[in-house]
Amino acid sequence: MPVRIIGMIGVTPPSSDATLHVIEGGLSPNYLTAFARAHDEAGFDLALVGYSSSSAEGFLVALYAAMQTQRLGFLVAHRPGFVAPTLMARKIATFDHLTGGRLAVHIVTGKTDDEQHGDGDFSPKAERYRRAAEYLELMQLAWSNERPFDFTGEFYSVQGASSDVRPLQKPHPLLFFGGASAGALAMGAKWCDVYAIYGEPLASTRERIAAFRGQAAAFGRKPGFNVSLRPIIAATEGAAWDKANRILAAMTGKKGWSRQEEATGPVDNAGKRLMSFALEADVHDERLWMPIARATGALGNTSCLVGTPEQVANAMLEYYRLGVDSFLIRGFDPLNDAIEFGRELIPRIKSGALEMDGLRAAQ
């Protein structure tokens, strides 16, 4: 199976040398162009465009970036609940055609209630997952029905709904999702194509893949799996560990980070899982390094792989061996790291995956 490499683009330059998140305020078209082109030239297959209740609108960001690039696809984060699902179905289909099929969608329900409140949604999280499942069902009905249809559900009802535009990709662009709660897994097993998880130890990842495959099989589905990691690479292993410790020092030296975040801890189930591994040990499986996850309260993609490019690529291929077919990778110096990953890491991952596929086929 071909391996998919995903990056993440932001719209403004980072505010420090060691950046945890790329979603910041403002909007710089020049920086967005440079960032997207760097991913395009580096060999990334997709670039995630994140979502927050205060950031630039993701689909417009992705459409602009698509106009500045040649082949890069875009994984656009989208929160159900703020747009009618039939309208969103047409929006996704339109985007897919205008970009020549360079779209995937990451379904997010909102990490915190405060984030949802900022856009006027006061629904509890369990309800948001049920709403998202119904939303996805209605979107897929809009894509698949050639005649007007009716739908009555808990959250949405339509009469005579139809769409004159359907996605270029068949049956539709890939739908990603993440989360570790029962609601997230129930939604994703039935309606999504790729389960996105944070970088956990190999044994835990193997268990999660097996469990979710079983859950999706009940609906006749064979999902893909994405693991999110922060590679920290250097010419020698010692230099890579020195670099990792410098990044940690920069992170923990920031006002508002470190002990406060570690004390409060993550609020979502996926973050709680990540924090449990970070508290268990600094290093798992030789290269999976967790102190940044611990120091920042496991806020998002904070598990790292540390080593030379060859060592980190080999570590990632161990996840590929388990059935992970895509990786979201980004560094702490977002633009420069994307360039370095394209030069040193991505070719090794892709060639290693092809070699592994060849060995499997020969058996």
Predicted regions and their residues:
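Glycine-rich anion/phosphate-binding loops
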Residues: 81-97
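Hydrophobic faces of well-ordered beta-strands that scaffold small-molecule active sites
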Residues: 3-9, 47-49, 73-78, 103-107, ...
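An alpha-helical appendage that flanks or caps ligand/catalytic pockets
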Residues: 2-12, 111, 119, 125-169, ...
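Glycine-rich, proline-tolerant flexible connector loops at the mouths of alpha/beta enzymes
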Residues: 46-65, 199-204, 329-342
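Conserved, mostly hydrophobic/aromatic
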Residues: 39, 43, 65, 95, ...
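Short, acidic/polar
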Residues: 24-38, 91, 178-187, 305-319
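Alpha-helix-loop-beta-strand connector modules within alpha/beta enzyme cores
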Residues: 58-79, 131-135, 217-221, 341-358
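N-terminal beta1-alpha1-beta2 module of alpha/beta enzyme domains
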Residues: 1-71, 168-173
